Structures are given as structure tokens and as C-alpha cells.
């Protein structure tokens, strides 16, 4: 129990499972950092070579593309820290700080994965010249979803911290539930956006999408990961609706089956798929398609810009 007599856990956290997931997320985070660095450097050289033959194209800077994966990396290490502090709690369930850290970190880490998914999808649609196929204006698409993601993150973080005290546990639970429902709402809208994007693209393909098919596999990977986060968030929302004495909160296996495992599968999909389908590859294919379109006389929109960042900035003026 905590100092005020409030019982932090309804069970004693399993040490073995906590260690396993701590190691899995730590190794995954390090592995992805290495992959990201390798493919960023490789893509920069490749794009530089392509641009020599036709420099006036629509493109992203390498740092901007790599930046879409940064929240994902933070998510891996935040998840790692969360499970590491569950190891601490397994030895003494009355310690308050480990409880707060593991609660908050395990709650908010999926919002970091979500931020990367939003940004990768937005960049992919822009490189495909298919912004008009999204359900909201391209300039605001990623921003709106990320704002919702940040709002969800803050509510869950604040609520998770408040749950450590008996006097604020109920209010904290309500905040976490609200944050989870915001996440569910935005993610539900985003999944609809992804699915509609696939159907619209099949009926109205762009010059990039008809020349290369990598974007389809990247979008499928993003869609699968989106469903993993959605399922996890729904279960966690039910947990907090049931309350402290509910079925889910009273049994640790729910945390691993419906939170730890789905989030590790998400991370695994990112890592395994990355060498084959990533935003750097879409970027290179977009440049090649633009060059081919210009050389063979195909009509191609918005090519006469030096970068996507400058193009979008000019449109907002």
C-alpha cells in the first residue's frame, strides 16, 4: 500500500514478464535507430544522385523524412522504461514513484507510435501527389491528428499520475478514460481516412502510384498498426470504465495480452518491414516518377517547386 493506505496494485507484478518486455523494447529501439540511420544515409546519397539529372522536383529533405520516425523511437524507449519500473514494483508494490512511472509511460507510449503513423502517412500521400484524396485538407491533415494525439497523451499522463493517490484516483481515472476515448475517436477517423485513401487511389491513381506499388504495402503496414493501437486503446478504456476493482485491472495478463503484446507486434512490424517499405523508398520512387513523367511529356502537377516544405509554405501565404 501507499503511505495513505491506498493499494496501488490489485496483484503483484510478474518480474519475468516485466524483464522480458523491458529487453524486447530496448533491443527494438536500438535496432530501429541503427536501421533509420543506415537508410537515411543511403537514401540521401541516392536522392542526391537522382537530383543531379533533374534537380527541380518536388521532394522532402532527408531530416524531415527521418523525423517522422522519431516519435516511434521515443515510444520504444518509453515503453522500455515503463516495463523496467514494473520490475521495481514487482519487488515492492508499495513504492509510489515506480507505480506512477510505469502507469504513465505504458499509457502514453502508443500515442508516440500514433504520431509517427500520422506523419508517415501524410508524407506518403504528399509524395504520391494524392493529398486531395484525404478526407481533410493536406496542410492540416497531419497537424489535426497530431494535435488530437498530443491532447490524448496529456490527459493520460496527468490522469495516470493522479491515480497514485486515493483522493484523486477517481478523477485521474476519468482523465485517462477521456484521453483514451479521444485517442480512439481520432484513430477511428484516421483508419477511415486510410481505407478511403486506398479505394480512392484505386479509382483515381496518380502518376507516381501507377508506376510504383511500394506505397500500397507501406499503407497496409500503417493500417495494421493502426488497428493494433485501436484495439489496445479500446481494452484500456474498458479497463478504466470498469474501475479499480474491475476484471481487467485485477488481472495482470490483460496488460500483456492487450497492451504489451500488441505494441511489441507494432514495433516488430515497423522493424521487419522497414528495409522493404519505408518513406525513404517512397520518396525515391516519387522523384523517379516525376523525372519519367517530365521526360515522356506526361502531365504532372506541382513539379516546379524546390521542395515540398517550400511548396506548402507558399500555399499557406
From Swiss-Prot:
Cleaved signal peptide residues: none
UniProt topological domain (Extracellular) ranges: 1-16, 86-99, 164-178, 236-259
Major place of residence: membrane
Record topological domains on the Cytoplasmic side: 38-64, 121-142, 200-214, 281-317
Disulphide bond pairs: none
Transmembrane segments: 17-37, 65-85, 100-120, 143-163, 179-199, 215-235, 260-280
Keywords: Membrane, Transmembrane, Transmembrane helix
Entry-linked Pfam families: RTA1
Any GO CC annotation of this UniProt entry: endoplasmic reticulum
Membrane disposition: Multi-pass membrane protein
InterPro entries, A to Z: RTA1
Superkingdom per UniProt: Eukaryota
Subcellular location: Membrane
Function of the molecule: Involved in 7-aminocholesterol resistance.
Similarity comment: Belongs to the lipid-translocating exporter (LTE) (TC 9.A.26.1) family.
Protein known as: Protein RTA1
Native source species: Saccharomyces cerevisiae (strain ATCC 204508 / S288c)
